[in-house]
UniProtKB/Swiss-Prot annotation:
PROSITE patterns linked: PROLINE_PEPTIDASE
Swiss-Prot/TrEMBL keywords: Hydrolase, Manganese, Metal-binding
Family: Belongs to the peptidase M24B family.
Domain of life (superkingdom): Bacteria
InterPro entries to which the protein is assigned, alphabetical: Creatin/AminoP/Spt16_N, Creatinase/aminopeptidase-like, Creatinase_N, Pept_M24, Peptidase_M24B, Peptidase_M24B_aminopep-P_CS
Protein name as it appears in the record: Uncharacterized peptidase MW1651
Top EC class of this enzyme: hydrolase
Cofactor binding note of this UniProt entry: Binds 2 manganese ions per subunit.
Positions with a binding annotation for Mn(2+) 1: 226, 290, 319, 333
Signal peptide start and end residues: none
Gene3D superfamilies documented for this protein: Creatinase/methionine aminopeptidase superfamily, Creatinase/prolidase N-terminal domain
Binding site for Mn(2+) 2: 215, 226, 333
Names of required cofactors: Mn(2+)
């Protein structure tokens, strides 16, 4: 069943006439055309009969025509009201309720004479949750490039270098491999600074005998990777190395349990129980992982409260961590494809 067919099914389920999609990544997912319109209207209308209409600034029309999108295009000037160019009466409209602003909703009421709204967010999340072979190949390449980033960063480590210098070196060097954009702000944290799970790289200088935490990802043809490695520089303290071994055991055990039909919360419990049994439960303050695709964090989450089941075609992260102030912060993260038989680890830098 195609993506559009799934939306039409949801329109029928909710007795709605059309769906209105405005999140740029979701529009790209359905059309193959990517735009960042800022304040301008950029939206895809999917009607119950399968017709698709893309609203975009007139200056982008030729780009849309060159894209895979084959539906109708409504291009508008900045001085025009887009709705006046495509007059419609839509009794019930499905929207991305988590994203659509009140101002845009008012425009829809007046522009399309909408009487009521429904939600299409969950349907889109469920579609994006299961990756196609093409999407998987792009994520696999993004993961390969993330491995390269770690390699670049580790090779640059030397006593006295700052966190910020290592970040800059990684992001400049990886451009030689065709990477134009990182998935998120690259994180490099030294020693006990890594005890802040989302710390900001700064001017802290690397000292002998401490761990270095790398958390990074790249975007390849719109798809993200996201991986973390914690690397020894010299011989860290006995407690820091003990923490590392516990995190590695938790991650390995959780990954080995992945297969279709297993509740996501069970995977979280496996890692969390190992860390708790070793006395560090209070120092693992976040969920075990999350979905990965067009965004570095997307549906679904790997958490203790998510009873949904793993399915073949999902790509998730597994990233346990222990963060002890004044001692060390250790996190290890891999990107995992759920396969029919079990799993495939997409990130490969040594641990």
């Amino acid at each position: 069943m195609t993506k559009i067919s799934k939306i039409i099914d949801e329109l029928n389920n909710q007795q709605a006439d059309a769906a209105w999609i405005t999140t740029p990544l979701n529009v790209y997912y359905f059309t193959g055309y990517r735009s960042e319109p800022h304040e301008r209207l950029f939206a895809l209308l999917i009607k119950k009969d399968g017709k698709q209409v893309l609203f975009c600034p007139k200056m982008e029309v030729e780009e849309v025509k060159a894209s895979p999108f084959t539906g109708e295009i409504v291009g508008y000037l900045d001085t025009e009201n887009p709705f006046s160019l495509y007059p419609q009466t839509i009794n019930k409209l499905l929207i991305e309720s988590e994203h659509l602003t009140v101002a845009r909703q008012k425009q829809l009421i007046s522009g399309f004479n909408v009487n009521s709204f429904g939600d299409v967010d969950l349907t889109i999340k469920q579609l994006r949750n299961i990756k196609s072979e093409d999407e998987i190949s792009k994520i696999r390449k993004a993961a390969e490039l993330a491995d390269k980033c770690i390699e670049i960063g580790v090779s640059y480590l030397k006593e006295g270098v700052t966190e910020r210098e290592v970040v800059n070196h990684i992001e400049q060097t990886i451009k030689q491999y065709g990477v134009n954009e990182m998935s998120f702000d690259t994180m490099v944290l030294f020693g006990d600074h890594a005890a802040s799970p989302h710390g900001t790289p700064g001017d802290r200088r690397l000292k002998s005998n401490e761990y270095v935490l790398f958390d990074l990802g790249v975007i390849y043809e719109h798809y993200c990777s996201d991986m973390t490695r914690t690397i020894k520089f010299g011989e860290p303290s006995k407690e820091a190395q003990e923490i590392y071994n516990i995190v590695l055991e938790a991650e390995t055990s959780a990954i080995q349990a992945i297969k279709p039909g297993i509740p996501l919360k069970d995977i979280d419990h496996i890692a969390r129980n190992i860390i708790s049994e070793k006395g560090y439960g209070e120092y693992f303050p976040h969920r075990l992982g999350h979905g990965l695709g067009l965004q570095e964090h997307e549906y679904q989450d790997v958490s203790s409260t998510n009873s949904n089941l793993l399915e073949a075609g999902m790509v998730i992260t597994i990233e346990p961590g222990i963060y002890v102030p004044s001692v060390a912060g250790v996190r290890i993260e891999d990107d995992i494809l759920v396969t029919n038989e079990g799993y495939e680890v997409l990130t490969h830098y040594e641990k």
